[in-house]
C-alpha cells in the first residue's frame, strides 16, 4: 500500500481560504448606532435624494393643479358661451315659431280688413242711396220753402246734423252764400196796433204761425228734457205769445216764405267726406231776433 505524505493544516488550501476571509467585527461594531454611523454618509445622501425627489414631485403636482385650474376656467368659459348660444338658439327658435304664427295672424287680419273694407264700401253706397232718396223725397214732398236742404234758419236749427251733412258734401247753388247771409236775421220786433181790425181771423192765424216760428227758434236754442217737455210746452208757448208783438203780420209771413226758398241744387252729385259725418252743433250760432 502506497503511503501518502502527511499534509498539515497550515499547508491545506482550505486554511488558506479561511485566512483570506475578513475578520469578524467586534460586537460593539454590530449595534444600530455603529451600523448607522458607518453608513451615515450614504444615509445623508439617501435623505437628500428623497427630499429632492419629493420637491420635484410636489412641483410637478402644483404645475398639474395650475394647469387643471386653467383648463377648468376655460371649460367654464366655454360652457358659459355654449349656454348663451343655446339660449339664443332657443330664443330664435321661439321667434321663428312666433313669426309663423304671426304670418297666419296677418293673413287672418288681411281677410278681416278686406271684409271690413267691403262692408264700409257697402255702407257708403247705402248712405249715398239714402241721401239721394232723401233729396228726391224732399224735392217732391216738401211744402213751400220748407225743405230740409235749404238755408232756412228753421231747418238749420231743427236738423243741424242733417243740414251740415248735406251742405258739407253737396254743391250749393250760385246764390247760396247770398241767401245764407240774407237769412241770418228774421225781423219780428214789430208792434200790433191796438185797433179792432186786428181781431180778424186772418190776422190771428198769421200771428199764431209767427208765434209758433218764434217758439221753434227758442226751443232749438234751449232744448227741453223729454220728461219736462210736456209740462213746459204750454207755458213756453204762452210766454212766447205774450212777448212777441206784431205790428203788421201780413208783411212778415211773405218775407219769411221768400227767404226760406231752397238754395241747394238737388241734382248735384254727392261727394261724401268720411270725416264730416258729425256736425259740431256748438258752431251753429242762433240768429239775432231784432
Curated annotation (Swiss-Prot):
Comp. bias (Acidic residues): 195-205
Annotated spans, Disordered: 173-211
Keywords, sorted A to Z: Coiled coil, Cytoplasm, Cytoplasmic vesicle, Transport, Vacuole
GO cellular-component term (any): cytoplasmic vesicle
Location(s) in or outside the cell: Cytoplasmic vesicle; Vacuole; Cytoplasm
Coiled-coil region list: 54-130
Superkingdom of this protein's organism: Eukaryota
Subunit organization: Component of the biogenesis of lysosome-related organelles complex-1 (BLOC-1) composed of at least BLI1, BLS1, CNL1, KXD1, SNN1 and VAB2.
Physiological role: Component of the biogenesis of lysosome-related organelles complex-1 (BLOC-1) involved in endosomal cargo sorting.
UniProt record similarity statement: Belongs to the VAB2 family.
Name recorded for this polypeptide: Biogenesis of lysosome-related organelles complex 1 subunit VAB2
Species the sequence originates in: Candida glabrata (strain ATCC 2001 / BCRC 20586 / JCM 3761 / NBRC 0622 / NRRL Y-65 / CBS 138)
Amino acid at each position: 500500500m502506497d503511503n501518502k505524505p502527511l499534509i498539515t493544516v497550515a499547508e491545506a488550501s482550505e486554511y488558506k481560504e479561511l485566512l483570506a476571509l475578513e475578520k469578524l467585527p467586534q460586537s460593539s461594531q454590530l449595534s444600530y448606532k455603529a451600523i448607522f454611523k458607518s453608513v451615515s454618509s450614504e444615509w445623508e445622501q439617501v435623505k437628500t435624494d428623497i427630499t429632492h425627489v419629493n420637491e420635484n414631485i410636489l412641483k410637478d403636482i402644483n404645475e398639474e393643479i395650475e394647469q387643471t385650474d386653467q383648463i377648468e376656467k376655460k371649460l367654464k368659459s366655454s360652457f358659459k358661451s355654449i349656454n348663451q348660444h343655446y339660449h339664443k338658439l332657443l330664443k330664435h327658435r321661439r321667434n321663428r315659431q312666433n313669426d309663423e304664427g304671426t304670418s297666419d295672424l296677418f293673413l287672418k287680419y288681411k281677410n278681416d280688413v278686406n271684409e271690413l273694407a267691403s262692408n264700409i264700401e257697402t255702407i257708403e253706397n247705402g248712405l249715398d242711396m239714402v241721401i239721394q232718396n232723401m233729396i228726391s223725397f224732399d224735392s217732391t214732398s216738401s211744402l213751400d220753402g220748407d225743405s230740409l236742404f235749404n238755408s232756412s234758419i228753421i231747418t238749420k236749427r231743427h236738423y243741424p246734423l242733417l243740414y251740415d251733412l248735406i251742405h258739407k258734401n253737396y254743391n250749393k247753388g250760385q246764390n247760396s252764400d247770398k241767401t245764407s247771409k240774407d237769412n241770418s236775421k228774421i225781423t219780428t220786433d214789430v208792434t200790433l196796433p191796438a185797433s179792432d181790425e186786428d181781431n180778424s181771423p186772418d190776422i190771428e192765424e198769421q200771428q199764431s204761425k209767427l208765434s209758433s216760428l218764434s217758439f221753434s227758434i227758442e226751443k232749438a236754442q234751449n232744448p227741453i228734457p223729454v220728461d219736462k217737455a210736456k209740462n213746459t210746452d204750454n207755458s213756453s208757448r204762452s210766454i212766447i205769445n205774450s212777448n212777441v208783438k206784431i205790428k203788421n203780420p201780413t208783411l212778415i209771413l211773405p218775407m219769411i216764405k221768400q227767404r226760406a226758398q231752397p238754395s241747394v241744387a238737388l241734382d248735384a252729385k254727392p261727394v261724401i267726406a268720411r270725416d264730416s259725418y258729425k256736425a259740431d252743433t256748438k258752431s251753429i250760432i242762433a240768429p239775432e231776433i231784432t
